[in-house]
A protein has these predicted regions:
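Face-selective signature of the C-terminal outer-membrane beta-barrel domain
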Residues: 1-9, 22, 83-91, 125, ...
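Transmembrane beta-strands of outer-membrane beta-barrel pores
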Residues: 1-7, 33-39, 48, 76-78, ...
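Signature of Gram-negative outer-membrane beta-barrel scaffolds
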Residues: 1-27, 39-40, 50
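Short sequence motifs at beta-strands and strand-loop junctions characteristic
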Residues: 7-11, 61-66, 117-121, 161-165, ...
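Outer-membrane beta-barrel translocator domains and adjoining extracellular loop/strand segments
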Residues: 9-15, 42-50, 55-57, 99-108, ...
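Hydrophobic, lipid-facing positions within transmembrane beta-strands of outer-membrane proteins
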Residues: 13-19, 58, 68-72, 123-127, ...
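Membrane-embedded beta-barrel scaffold of Gram-negative outer-membrane proteins
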Residues: 22, 30, 61-115, 119-121
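Gram-negative outer-membrane beta-barrel transporters
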Residues: 87-95, 115-198
Length: 218
């Protein structure tokens, strides 16, 4: 339990609880729940929008963001061929009570910042596995699913520019003396929703309503 005082928002209490249970040396369970507060600095945190030629409209008296967060995770350590396969799965749910909404849908030529009036939440599930195939070489894979929705002017929609899923595969090799390390990473970014487009003079949309998945190798 934590208490804070802000000269702008006054006194507030932040409760949080954590629970960990290890039934044996191979499986670990964790649960967490708590409340969080956050002051949003809209221009500093969304400065990429300043180069988009959108008109910026910031409402007065923006609230401090407030949300409940719940999480659960399980970690397993499985001995295979003298080495350990580590698998970790986790799920988090965030429910916003107060939030500063970044609205790029109401006006395709502008962006509005205002207090949430409705529901806003996110579900995130991620699974990760790592295994050292031989000395110095480790292969790690991860996959994440995200469902994030916010209410924009009375309509609850998927948050724009947020990928529905992401995948990552990393191969890492370190030389015997530990002087050099080489990494190869393959990343998959799933598609998502674009901000609402507008119609051009010929009736065509200014851009697609959704963007597709893409891969990146480095």
């Amino acid at each position: 339990l934590r208490g804070d005082y802000s000269n702008e928002h006054g006194f507030f209490v932040t409760p949080r609880a954590h629970l960990k249970y290890n039934p044996n040396e191979y499986v670990h369970f964790r649960l967490s729940a708590g409340k969080g507060y956050r002051t949003n600095h809209v221009l500093a945190e969304n400065n990429y929008l300043l180069s988009s030629s959108r008109k910026v409209d910031i409402a007065k008296n923006l609230d401090m963001e407030e949300a409940w967060n719940y999480g659960a995770s399980v970690s397993t350590y499985i001995p295979i061929f003298g080495k350990t396969l580590n698998i970790n799965a986790e799920y988090y749910y965030t429910d916003f009570l107060k939030q500063v909404v970044v609205d790029m849908d109401s006006n395709p030529h502008g962006v509005s910042f205002y207090n949430l009036d409705g529901r806003s939440y996110s579900h995130v599930f991620q699974v990760e596995a790592s295994y050292p195939f031989f000395k110095g070489f480790t292969l790690t894979g991860a996959y994440r699913l995200t469902d994030a929705q916010t209410t924009y002017k009375g309509e609850r929609m998927e948050r724009p520019l947020t990928s529905k899923y992401k995948g990552l595969l990393t191969a890492s090799y370190q030389t015997p003396l530990g002087i050099w390390q080489f990494d190869a990473t393959l990343q998959l970014n799933g598609g998502g929703r674009m901000p609402s487009p507008y119609e051009l003079g010929d009736g065509q949309l200014s851009w697609n309503r959704r963007y597709g998945s893409f891969e990146q190798l480095s």
